[in-house]
């Protein structure tokens, strides 16, 4: 009885091995059919090439494999004793590794991995060399191979100790001292923001900056006659303010919203209001350009009601101050309103302990090197302090104020320029003081490590999604081609893949004619960020693709020119230079370099470049117009030709031009004339007031009295992009 049960068990094992070998053979046959048979398997080659496979050959192969398994099982105890005396090979593995990577780590071929997975629940038919394996299957393969696994450093490092630097807990209220308010001037383009600041700080910034539009963020400390101080931030279209808010930087205490009394509420006015509300910052309304005859401050206040900005005149809490930045009228009232609101907010800070602040701007200065403009929010900054901002650090070499004057200390709410940075941090990054340079490196290394870990997690998610897509595609393919023989199935799959082959270079060039690749270079980090935010609003990809190849801070370099040549792109520079050597190199390579000092001029240039990539549009320009007074027909050969008797009302009719026939305002025919006569004479031009007879190239056209004949010419004009960036 026991022998019969043993035989039955052996038969069941044989049946399982037979099915698994059949699946594995199909995989090997398909791979060998694609790439040619390996000389390492000459016997298999003869068996696999013959189709269909003889049953006795497959059965023999299965029996041979089964005998081998039985022999190994019988020799198990002796084999295990022998293997225990030898050290096991250690294989370094990681999560998400592919079959090919696992085989390479084990120093085996991929077939070895497939065979190790035969007696598992995994669907071998769905696996390819680049398929990613779960942790359980990696362990299964390593165990069956008699090897030891070792997880790579990527997994072990997850328990690494946190070395980051963070802000200190809130200080004891008794230690806090009053500080100056930090005010951001916001509003629509050319509503007078820079001119307003110019009057406050008694400089000529607005006169220097072409067009009166702010070129990049500046931070300025303004001392009022009363002794109070206000720190102003000047933003370029408030794009950088939005970016700072997105990073969680709460720098601004008060927003002064500048609205022109003659223009009223505009698009960027609404955006400014939304930014202030999102940051939960109170607003003071400055109604500018009140010196103009068409100024209407009350209209501005009423328009703002629609955006939940209610001035004190209408029962709200928003102070409204009518001013003229050009003449300086009522500016002190605006300053007093700002100071009064700051007193109500009770702004205080701790001037002691390690420094905390926020990066306002980053740029490269030829004389000073890497420089950041920052607002100090806590502590007192001194020369020699070691700072960390994002993944950058600095040992402060030099500090200077908004006028370039060297200073020894910077207190809370004070804007300061800082040199000594190893790399440039981005606008909005948090600045923290640490005790030493080694500690700064430790913090930066930790933040870079965290970024790598986050990227690794994102990559794993992408891998998992692709794996899921691959599995679904494989399942659909099995449902679609499962009933076919493997050869027919492979041919159909090949034909499908052939349709997805990338375009040839010539075809790609034709397609890329409707693509504009750009490289952006700016003088400071905020300028570049503001331009990038404008480019983010591009919504006309159906007309022309806009691709950002590279962006950075500093003058145009040889690398920028090489990139532009590679991608057939255009270099846009903002407040930067391109040396003679660079310009000569660009000219030889056919690369356009466009330098601007006004941000909206750069955007207009970009719009023109996009428009130049669009196909030309055709416009009709009328030359003359005639009305039909009578209709008749003439006989030419054996057919009757309809003729219209007309009188020219406007311009002139020229036979070589194009014509159209309109009836009740609708065009019913377009084409050319076959005949144009005055009395019985053939003529080429009929002028205003003259009568004529004409026939069309459409024989079946029936004229009606009152129809109009329009003579016109077609002109090709350059199409314009539909993208409206809001300037």
From Swiss-Prot:
Name of this protein: Translation initiation factor IF-2, mitochondrial
Location relative to the cell: Mitochondrion
Annotated region described as G5, given as residue ranges: 324-326
Native source organism of the sequence: Homo sapiens
GO annotation (BP), single: regulation of translational initiation
Transit peptide: 1-29
Function statement: One of the essential components for the initiation of protein synthesis. Protects formylmethionyl-tRNA from spontaneous hydrolysis and promotes its binding to the 30S ribosomal subunits. Also involved in the hydrolysis of GTP during the formation of the 70S ribosomal complex.
Gene that this polypeptide is encoded by: MTIF2
Residues covered by the tr-type G domain: 178-348
PROSITE patterns: G_TR_2, IF2
Expression sites by tissue: Expressed in all tissues examined. Highest level in skeletal muscle.
Residue ranges of the region described as G4: 288-291
CDD domains: IF2_eIF5B (cd01887), IF2_mtIF2_II (cd03702), mtIF2_IVc (cd03692)
Residues engaged in binding GTP: 187-194, 234-237, 288-291
Subunit organization: Monomer.
Record keywords, A-Z: GTP-binding, Initiation factor, Mitochondrion, Nucleotide-binding, Phosphoprotein, Protein biosynthesis, Transit peptide
InterPro entries recorded: EF-G-like_DII, IF2_II, P-loop_NTPase, Small_GTP-bd, T_Tr_GTP-bd_dom, TF_IF2_bacterial-like, TIF_IF2, TIF_IF2_dom3
Residue segments, region G3: 234-237
GO CC, alphabetical: cytoplasm; mitochondrion; nucleoplasm
Sequence segments annotated as region (G2): 212-216
SUPFAM superfamilies according to UniProt: Initiation factor IF2/eIF5b, domain 3, P-loop containing nucleoside triphosphate hydrolases, Translation proteins
Domain of life, per lineage: Eukaryota
Family: Belongs to the TRAFAC class translation factor GTPase superfamily. Classic translation factor GTPase family. IF-2 subfamily.
């Amino acid at each position: 009885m026991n022998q019969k049960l043993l035989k039955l068990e052996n038969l069941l094992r044989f049946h399982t091995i037979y099915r698994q070998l059949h699946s594995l053979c199909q995989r090997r046959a398909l791979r060998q059919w694609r790439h040619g048979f390996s000389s390492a398997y000459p016997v298999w080659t003869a068996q696999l090439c013959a189709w269909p496979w003889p049953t006795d050959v497959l059965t023999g192969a299965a029996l041979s494999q089964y005998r081998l398994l039985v022999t190994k099982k019988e020799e198990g105890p002796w084999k295990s004793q022998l293997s225990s005396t030898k050290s096991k090979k250690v294989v370094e593995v990681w999560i998400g590794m592919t079959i090919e990577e696992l085989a390479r780590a084990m120093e085996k071929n991929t077939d070895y991995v497939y065979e190790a997975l035969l007696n598992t629940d995994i669907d071998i038919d769905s696996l390819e060399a680049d398929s990613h394996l779960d942790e359980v299957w990696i362990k299964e393969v390593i165990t069956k191979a008699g090897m030891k696994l070792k997880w790579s450093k990527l997994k072990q490092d997850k328990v690494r100790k946190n070395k980051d630097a963070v802000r200190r807990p809130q200080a004891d209220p008794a230690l806090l001292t009053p500080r100056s308010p930090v005010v951001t001037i916001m509003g629509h383009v050319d509503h007078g923001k820079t001119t307003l600041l110019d009057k406050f700080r008694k400089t000529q910034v607005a006169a220097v900056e072409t067009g009166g539009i702010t070129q990049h963020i500046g931070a300025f400390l303004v001392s009022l006659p009363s002794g109070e101080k206000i720190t102003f931030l000047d933003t370029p279209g408030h794009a950088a303010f939005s970016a700072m808010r997105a990073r969680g930087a709460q720098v601004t205490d008060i927003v002064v919203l500048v609205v022109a009394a003659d223009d009223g509420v505009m698009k960027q006015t609404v955006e400014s209001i939304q930014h202030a509300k999102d940051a939960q910052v109170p607003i003071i309304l400055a109604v500018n350009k009140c010196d103009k005859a068409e100024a209407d401050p009350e209209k501005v206040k009423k328009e703002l009601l629609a955006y939940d900005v209610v001035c004190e005149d209408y029962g709200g809490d928003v102070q409204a101050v009518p001013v003229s930045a050009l003449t300086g009228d009522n500016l002190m009232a605006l300053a007093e309103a700002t100071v009064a609101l700051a007193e109500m907010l009770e702004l205080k800070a701790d001037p002691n302990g390690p420094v905390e602040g926020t990066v306002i701007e980053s740029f490269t200065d030829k004389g000073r090197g890497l420089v950041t403009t920052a607002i100090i929010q806590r502590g007192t900054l001194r020369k020699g302090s070691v700072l960390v901002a994002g993944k950058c650090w600095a040992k402060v070499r030099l500090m200077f104020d908004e006028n370039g004057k060297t200073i020894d200390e910077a207190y809370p709410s004070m804007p300061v320029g800082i040199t000594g940075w190893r790399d440039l941090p981005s606008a909005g990054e948090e600045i923290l003081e640490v005790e030493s340079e080694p500690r700064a490196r430790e913090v930066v290394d930790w933040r870079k490590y965290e970024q790598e870990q986050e990227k690794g997690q994102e990559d794993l998610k992408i891998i998992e999604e692709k794996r899921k897509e691959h599995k679904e595609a494989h399942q659909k393919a099995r449902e679609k081609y499962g009933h076919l023989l493997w050869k027919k199935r492979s041919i159909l799959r090949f034909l499908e893949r052939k349709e997805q082959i990338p375009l040839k270079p010539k075809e790609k060039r034709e397609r890329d004619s409707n693509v504009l690749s750009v490289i952006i270079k700016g003088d400071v980090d905020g300028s570049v960020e503001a331009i990038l935010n404008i480019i983010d609003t591009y919504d006309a990809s159906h007309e022309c693709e806009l691709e950002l190849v590279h962006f950075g801070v500093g003058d145009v370099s040889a690398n920028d020119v090489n990139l532009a040549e590679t991608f057939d792109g255009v270099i846009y520079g903002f407040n930067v230079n391109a040396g003679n050597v660079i310009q000569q190199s660009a000219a030889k390579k056919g690369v356009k370099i466009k330098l601007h000092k006004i941000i909206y001029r750069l955007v207009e240039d970009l719009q023109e470049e996009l428009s130049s990539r669009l196909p030309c549009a055709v416009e009709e320009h009328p030359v003359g117009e005639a009305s039909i007074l009578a209709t008749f027909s003439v006989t030419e050969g054996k057919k009757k030709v309809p003729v219209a008797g007309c009188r020219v009302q406007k311009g002139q009719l020229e036979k070589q031009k194009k014509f159209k026939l309109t009836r009740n305002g609708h065009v019913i025919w377009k084409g050319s004339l076959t005949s144009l006569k005055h009395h019985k004479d053939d003529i080429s031009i009929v002028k205003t007031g003259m009568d004529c007879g004409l026939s069309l190239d459409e024989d079946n056209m029936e004229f009606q009295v009152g129809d109009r004949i329009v003579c016109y010419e077609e002109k090709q004009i350059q199409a314009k992009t539909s993208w409206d960036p809001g300037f």
